[in-house]
């Protein structure tokens, strides 16, 4: 990389730029002389973010254009939210680094109410995540769960304009944008199980680029990698069979991976949960085992 500018492909959203800047700062910490440039790109998913349409944004819509930039050598690395990586990577690309995980929980955000249990019957709560909708409806079937699209700023404005009584957002996104004051409650995973990879920044690059792989290696966080490996195995297995709400969340306890997962119906009328523990080197295997268990129980 001597005398070369390392180009970081990123989405154009404020949060994506913030995450790319975090990677920029970490790389500069380990490689002070490295020249780095951010390369913001509008993705297919971004184009439809603010459209209140019934059409679901396709898988991979937030990363496809960034991957094209890597494949075409216009960028050296791409920075993603791990939860956006819902499709297999192209053969020529790899995901060598998962940065240390931020808070993986969801946040309850409201201008009037301290938590979801204090919302009056018929209150409108906003989220477009099927995972959140499913679990919220199961817990509070008397609420109106309404789709909520747009970036974080747009969603907060819709709350402020009174379109919603409350909304649910990822804690990590609010923290990165210095919007902690909006968080009324950090929702415990036992009450709202997080998405695969929530709170994790992932770095993608070309598989055969030894120089880049070497530069990125100090940013690799092993514990996060074990956790996401287990979580991703669940979603990879289940998404090949169905398009239902899925959640998977792993923690490490005493050198073991503790994985919780669920699958349900969007209306919350049916949720199947499971959990298990395994040695760290069997994290992925545990994910596949639990996913199979969920599918069998769900079909009964």
Swiss-Prot record:
It is an enzyme of class 2 (transferase). Pathway: Porphyrin-containing compound metabolism; protoporphyrin-IX biosynthesis; coproporphyrinogen-III from 5-aminolevulinate: step 2/4. Binds 1 dipyrromethane group covalently. Signal peptide: none annotated. Its cofactor is dipyrromethane. One of its GO terms (molecular function) is hydroxymethylbilane synthase activity. InterPro entries: HemC, Porphobilin_deaminase_N, Porphobilinogen_deaminase_C, Porphobilinogen_deaminase_C_sf. It comes from the Bacteria. The keyword Transferase applies. The modification S-(dipyrrolylmethanemethyl)cysteine is found at residue 242. Its EC number is 2.5.1.61. It catalyses: 4 porphobilinogen + H2O = hydroxymethylbilane + 4 NH4(+). GO terms for biological process: protoporphyrinogen IX biosynthetic process. The keyword Plastid does not apply. Keywords: Porphyrin biosynthesis, Transferase. The porphobilinogen subunits are added to the dipyrromethane group. NCBIfam families: hemC. This is Porphobilinogen deaminase. The gene is hemC.
